[in-house]
Amino acid sequence: MNPPTNPRACSPLARAGSFAPIHVVGGGLAGTEAAWQIAQAGLPVILSEMRPVRQSPAHHTDQLGELVCSNSFGAAASDRAAGLLKEELRQLGSLVIATADCHAVPAGGALAVDRARFSQALTEAIQNHPRITLRREEVTEIPEGIAVLCTGPLTSDPLAKALQAFTGLEYLSFFDASSPIVTGDSLNRAVVFQASRYDKGEAAYLNCPMTEAEYERFWRALVEAEQAPLKDFEREERKFFEGCLPIEEMARRGKDTLCFGPLKPVGLVDPRTGSRPYAVVQLRQEDKAGQLWNLVGFQTNLKWGEQQRVFRLIPGLEQAEFVRFGVMHRNTFLNSPQLLWPTLQFRRRPTLFAAGQLVGTEGYACAVAGGWLAGQNAARLALGLPLITLPPETMMGSLFQFISSADPRHFQPMPANFGLLPDLEGRKLRNKQERYGRYRDRALAALKTTGLVRQVQTA
């Protein structure tokens, strides 16, 4: 079923003054981008940001688009997933990415910014736009009319409760306990085998069998690995983590604890030996194409480098390519596959949009992409124009297709990665650089067919 446009919307030829303002809630990267796109479409916008009236535990200023973690937007090269996403946004006229480009600082192969100048420039752009009204206020209820929610991982309690009431408690998460995801073509298929326990149902899992010696080596590395520190406000709110124990904490309870938990081998036979392994790590399919696989039960708070080192000790994962590392942190996000269309509209209320980390995307550029799409579509809904869904060959199109169609039982936030894209036609390219270049070329060609690409204006 396709998302509807508003049949009562005004004609696109109507005067901008005849439109009610579209309300954007949240002045982070997604909200700033959404407000800009709506205003650039000729429509009035109210952008509500609660800082400094109410400060979040992670922010330090009242500037829009404040970068609370790293100052890096990820890889700059367009043959990298994060770089391709940013290039798509450049071609689509993103304010945030253009501002990042203007305030870039040397960072090797990444796009990093002077965070103070970057946020100041975004704030000035929004304040100076004649169609944007910036309100410093806390929004405690979901706005009426056409609105875009971009309140991020630290959504304030009153609005979070309103979202709970609107979506249903089970569709809103308050912490992110994610397992790592690896690409299917990086697995050692000579070791990994496909099966379900006791051969019940379809063979839905990939299984990495371990001998006792392999398990002991893995267990010892796991309990000795270095964990990522929690932020102060996360340490104060440990209740968010009680429902999902990190695998390294489980391992510390005893050498064999994992063998009776997520690594239990019961009901599985290693076809190489004809017998039950000592332990088994199971991988669950994340996408329809079978390109992304989740390490079941491996929610973790290990540092990312440690995750790669330790988890590559698992037989079959020696050369595993990680598209997402496990995380455990405070993060309010929606079960988007149950709630949203790829247009970022709520299924039960098409005049309400959401974007940013709230919808279950991960990373700065992904937040900007969500803001761009939600802003564009909110404006189009008001104008009575067809709404946008970008081609699945593009990074943006594949990302929002994923978050609106993934298995809702296991949904966790997802970053941009090439595993989301459809397979390339023709023979499989073994050279990763060549393969990623082909993905880029196909994505940018598909983007041009939409008619949305804007001419880059030189200064």
Swiss-Prot record:
Identify which top EC class this enzyme belongs to: transferase
Q: Which cofactor does it need?
A: FAD
- Location in or out of the cell: Cytoplasm
Give one GO biological process term.
tRNA wobble uridine modification
Cellular component aspect of the GO annotation: cytosol
Keywords (A to Z) from UniProt: Cytoplasm, FAD, Flavoprotein, Methyltransferase, NAD, NADP, Transferase, tRNA processing
Q: Return the Gene3D superfamilies for the record.
A: FAD/NAD(P)-binding domain
- As recorded in UniProt, its EC number(s) are 2.1.1.74
Q: Name one Pfam family in it.
A: GIDA
- Provide any one GO MF term from the record: tRNA (uracil(54)-C5)-methyltransferase activity, 5,10-methylenetetrahydrofolate-dependent
- Catalyzed reaction equations: uridine(54) in tRNA + (6R)-5,10-methylene-5,6,7,8-tetrahydrofolate + NADH + H(+) = 5-methyluridine(54) in tRNA + (6S)-5,6,7,8-tetrahydrofolate + NAD(+); uridine(54) in tRNA + (6R)-5,10-methylene-5,6,7,8-tetrahydrofolate + NADPH + H(+) = 5-methyluridine(54) in tRNA + (6S)-5,6,7,8-tetrahydrofolate + NADP(+)
The signal peptide, as residue positions, is none
* Residues the record lists as binding FAD: 26-31
Function of the protein: Catalyzes the folate-dependent formation of 5-methyl-uridine at position 54 (M-5-U54) in all tRNAs.
Q: Which HAMAP family match?
A: TrmFO (MF_01037)
Q: Which NCBIfam families match?
A: gid_trmFO, PRK05335.1
Query: What is stated as this protein's family in its record?
Result: Belongs to the MnmG family. TrmFO subfamily.
What is the protein name stated in its UniProt record? Methylenetetrahydrofolate--tRNA-(uracil-5-)-methyltransferase TrmFO
Species of origin reads Synechococcus sp. (strain JA-2-3B'a(2-13)) (Cyanobacteria bacterium Yellowstone B-Prime)
Q: Which gene encodes it?
A: trmFO
